[in-house]
Amino acid sequence: MVKIGVLGLQGAVREHVRSIEACGAEAVVIKKVEQLTQIDGLIIPGGESTTMRRLMDKYGFIEPLKQFAREGKPMFGTCAGLIILAKKIVGYDEPHLGLMDITVERNSFGRQRESFEASLAIKGVADDFIGVFIRAPHIVSVGADVDVLATYEDRIVAARQGQFLGCSFHPELTDDHRMTQYFINMVKETKE
């Protein structure tokens, strides 16, 4: 059985655990760097990206997470997690992990649209996935080898680059586990 970690520093941790378990995989909440060796793939959840970054610095996660990526292990960033994975963030000089060749903009759907749901067609996942957007970022641009998986109102809201998967919305907040299953399948492929 594959083991999927959820970075447990801040954000929607419990909901991701529930979704992973609903897909028949084992979930591990990651609170210590040493735990990264126990898992096959990692979800970086939604929350608040600057707070998450502060905690990642405090607990020494930045370099170990980059090493985890260098080992070829899949990583899935949702909402704030997407921002953590991105190589460029609009209005910021430095990225967080800078692993995925995308540029993201924070809170890009505007204050008046703080949260909403939208039906999405996600390539390889579903034609009718309900995305829950909460102060969501979006992907402004992608590198040449990044596959755009979904758009909403002409904005990129899900993408994949090899072992990296990212989305603007919160797939863990509904009972539709197909996006989580897609990531688990990515992890299984790397183990084969």
From Swiss-Prot:
Chain positions recorded as L-glutamine binding sites: G47, E48, S49, R106, I134, R135
Enzyme Commission number, as recorded: 4.3.3.6, 3.5.1.2
Coiled coil start-end: none
Gene Ontology molecular function: glutaminase activity; pyridoxal 5'-phosphate synthase (glutamine hydrolysing) activity
Family: Belongs to the glutaminase PdxT/SNO family.
Subunit: In the presence of PdxS, forms a dodecamer of heterodimers. Only shows activity in the heterodimer.
Entries under PANTHER family matching the protein: PYRIDOXAL 5'-PHOSPHATE SYNTHASE SUBUNIT SNO (PTHR31559), PYRIDOXAL 5'-PHOSPHATE SYNTHASE SUBUNIT SNO1-RELATED (PTHR31559:SF0)
Full protein name: Pyridoxal 5'-phosphate synthase subunit PdxT
Natural source organism: Anoxybacillus flavithermus (strain DSM 21510 / WK1)
Gene behind this protein: pdxT
